[in-house]
Amino acid sequence: MVTEFIFLGLSDSQGLQTFLFMLFFVFYGGIVFGNLLIVITVVSDSHLHSPMYFLLANLSLIDLSLSSVTAPKMITDFFSQRKVISFKGCLVQIFLLHFFGGSEMVILIAMGFDRYIAICKPLHYTTIMCGNACVGIMAVAWGIGFLHSVSQLAFAVHLPFCGPNEVDSFYCDLPRVIKLACTDTYRLDIMVIANSGVLTVCSFVLLIISYTIILMTIQHRPLDKSSKALSTLTAHITVVLLFFGPCVFIYAWPFPIKSLDKFLAVFYSVITPLLNPIIYTLRNKDMKTAIRQLRKWDAHSSVKF
């Protein structure tokens, strides 16, 4: 019986691994700094105490958590002779990846719904997107994330692993792990696509439809009134594409390509959480103003101290 899995990682070259260590160390530092900056800014600035920024702060927390499931181990493994993870540790990675990933899908859908109400039904916005609704959305997000991760774990936990234990990646995920099972996994592959793949594609299509409706609504408004809404909407759409693009190929595409899978795995777990804070900060005047105010407050506090 297999008690551990060996990651093949991103490269066998020692020189390249040193470069990758420095690169991803900087990237992960940027992920921690950028996402925590958004959370602290939203919490500390009363002007940002609105449903959109509440959801944005929670999205940043989930991005940070999702990246932290894989990035720290990947970084430390660059200097390890054997990149090993225990069987239980592998299952924990699968659970957490799908827990945070499923929760993020719900939050992205909620953010799309929030923009739809704000732009298409502005008179009903405060009634629909009230405080209780925001708390309810987060409860649903965590609940769906939990149910989704449990269903994913159920696919793998009872599989027999008695032969190869090399995972051609830098973290454990269900599509890669089930290929190592000592049994026919064709039906299981179909079930994984039916679960994660259908959930991903349906969520993505729903968001594309909602943002298309919003864009059509904005087109009929005067330019001066639509510019701010369009700027915010562009940031949302960019983040949706960055998150769902890799997910569709990883979980819904029936013909995986190993080299592409590794690139998409890096993009999904590192690049997207790194870019999201940059996108929301650069495309949002309120966020940029709040961050400047936070810096002034920090500088003023330092002088007083």
Curated annotation (Swiss-Prot):
Keywords: Cell membrane, Disulfide bond, G-protein coupled receptor, Membrane, Olfaction, Receptor, Sensory transduction, Transducer, Transmembrane, Transmembrane helix. Disulfide bonds join 90-182. It is found in: Cell membrane. The keyword Membrane applies. GO terms for cellular component: plasma membrane. It comes from the Eukaryota. The chain crosses the membrane at residues 19-42, 51-72, 94-113, 133-151, 189-212, 229-251, 263-282. Residues 1-18, 73-93, 152-188, 252-262 are extracellular. Pfam families: 7tm_4. It is a multi-pass membrane protein. Residues 43-50, 114-132, 213-228, 283-305 are cytoplasmic. One of its GO terms (molecular function) is G protein-coupled receptor activity. Odorant receptor. This is Olfactory receptor 4F17.
